[in-house]
Design a protein with these regions (language model features):
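Hydrophobic/aromatic residues within the transmembrane alpha-helices of Major Facilitator Superfamily
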Residues: 24-31, 64, 68, 145, ...
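Alpha-helical membrane-protein architecture signal
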Residues: 13, 17, 194, 273-277, ...
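Helix-loop-helix hairpins and the membrane-proximal interhelical loops
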Residues: 1-50, 215-310, 452-456
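Juxtamembrane transmembrane-helix boundary signature
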Residues: 59-80, 111
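Helix-loop-helix junctions within the multi-pass membrane cores of secondary transporters/permeases
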Residues: 2-37, 58, 79-88, 92-140, ...
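Helix-coil boundary and interhelical linker segments in multi-pass alpha-helical membrane proteins
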Residues: 39-50, 89-100, 269-272, 373, ...
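Loop-to-helix transition at the N-terminal end of transmembrane alpha-helices
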Residues: 45-64
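Membrane-embedded alpha-helical modules
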Residues: 94-217, 353-461
């Protein structure tokens, strides 16, 4: 096989060794999703092992499409923020089944294929004001970090709606009248806090795969605590053994519990459309923003600041999302962690092909990834939130017409525990504030349509 001819290595001033090493680097920085995504989606009632398999296979397919359709070194996987919206907003917040949420993801993927074919996706993206785009990223970052703090039990419910975990008199009532005491939960909170510190140090030191290493080290400390008797497994209380279960050998968890399990039972058409739209908007921001941002670091943009072959890259994302929904996972999107592979010299689809193969091989290590607890992945959520909140520096808060809608969008996501509410309120407030202050003609017609749809949602839902 002539890899140079397929991926145009010489034309892109790279070689096979550089591309493969870059692909390995991208995988190392993204592999945390194999542990985090099952933990998040299982909160919605989905089978933990099946979600792991779906995550690995969907990541493989999406990244492979990127290599073949666009020849870019970008990798794809179920997106952070989108998985949180799936589990914590659509299912736990709005009360719909995960089968309904999967149906929305499938619909989004099919719509994306059409939008990518007819270049509508770029038009929607361009219609949203720059500051509001950045606000969506910041709001999702806060939302993800908040979920991480909750998963770690650092933030708990209380008389003030949310409160800080207390070492004194801790007592948590679980399902069916079971109660977790300080001796049960205290060690996991401590390990999560240590995990945040360790991951932060790795980020500051710019260690490759810092998020994945943070998860593994935190998990390792938990295993040590289990051997020392400080962490006592008790499945009835939700504290499972931290040791990988190889009793059945190396086996790949079945997709059967979640494969092609779609439902529209009990969901009003307008509300289903809003759910789909929220997936669409966030994925649009995620994908195009990541593509342009990472490509600019690799000098892949043309003289007009546009990315050649972007249609192929967007199509890979759309196909990845559609395939992912059928497999049983949330929206697949291009990962900003692809920048790590680019920084290692990755310039072609051979980098993403390498990453794709590693995602497929990860299926053989399912007992390892499935043994990683939520207190070990919580620091990853918090640090990913930190990365996303960094976009706040790009928002023009000196202009109230831009800053106020951006702030509303940011604040609404964690406070209302919903990404879609943040987008809705951000769009409505932007149109309202600017339309009545003499800037009505500067607002895109698409924004007026979106604002009207969101207002109708609040009136009739």
């Amino acid at each position: 096989m002539n890899l140079d001819k397929i991926f145009h290595l010489k034309e892109n001033h790279t070689d096979v060794k550089t591309e493969i090493m870059a692909g390995v680097t991208s995988f190392m920085t993204m592999a945390y999703i194999l542990a985090v995504n099952p933990n998040i989606l299982s909160a919605a009632g989905m089978d933990h092992g099946a979600v792991f398999s779906a995550t690995a296979i969907a990541s493989f397919l999406g990244t492979l499409c990127m290599a073949l359709f666009a020849n870019y070194p970008f990798a794809l996987a179920p997106g952070m923020g989108l998985n949180a919206y799936f589990a914590y907003t659509v299912v736990l917040g709005m009360g719909y089944s995960w089968q309904v949420a999967l149906a929305a993801v499938l619909a989004e993927g099919l719509i994306f294929i059409l939008l990518s074919l007819f270049n509508v996706r770029e038009a929607i993206f361009n219609a949203i004001p720059f500051n509001l785009k950045k606000a969506v990223s910041v709001g999702i970052g806060l939302f993800i970090a908040f979920i991480g703090l909750q998963n770690a039990k650092i933030v708990i419910g209380g008389s003030t709606l949310v409160g800080l975990f207390s070492l004194k008199g801790y007592n948590e009532t679980l399902a069916e009248g079971l109660t977790a005491s300080m001796s049960d939960a205290g060690i996991t909170v401590l390990l999560a806090v240590i995990g945040v510190i360790i991951t932060a140090v790795l980020v500051v030191k710019n260690i490759k795969g810092n998020i994945l290493w943070g998860i593994l080290i935190t998990w390792g400390l938990g295993v040590i605590c289990q051997f020392a008797g400080l962490y006592v497994p008790n499945p009835d209380l939700g504290f499972y053994s931290l040791l990988p279960d190889f009793s059945n050998g190396i086996s790949i968890p079945s997709l059967a519990p979640i494969f092609c399990k779609f439902s529209l039972d009990g969901v009003p058409l307008l509300e289903f459309a809003v759910i789909i739209f929220a997936f669409l908007v966030v994925d649009i921001f995620d994908t195009i923003g990541t593509l342009i941002g990472v490509a600019s670091k690799a000098d892949m943009l043309d003289k007009d600041g546009k990315l050649p072959r972007i249609k192929g890259a967007l199509m890979a994302d759309a196909i990845g999302t559609t395939a992912g929904a059928m497999l049983g996972t949330s929206t697949v999107t291009t990962f900003v962690e692809s920048a790590s592979g680019v920084s290692e010299g990755g310039r072609t689809g051979l980098t993403s092909l390498t990453t794709a193969v590693l995602f497929l091989l990860s299926l053989l290590l399912s007992p390892v990834f499935l043994a990683i607890p939520s207190f070990a992945t919580a620091p990853a959520l918090i640090v990913v939130g930190f990365y996303m909140v960094g976009a706040v520096s790009d928002i023009d808060f000196k202009d109230p017409g831009q800053g106020i809608p951006a702030f509303v969008c940011i604040a609404a996501m964690p406070f209302f525990y919903s990404i879609s509410e943040g987008i809705s309120m951000g769009v409505i407030s932007y149109v309202a504030v600017n339309a009545v202050t003499g800037k009505a003609k500067k607002i895109s017609p698409i924004m007026y349509v979106l604002a009207l749809l969101f207002i109708l949602k609040y009136i009739f839902m």
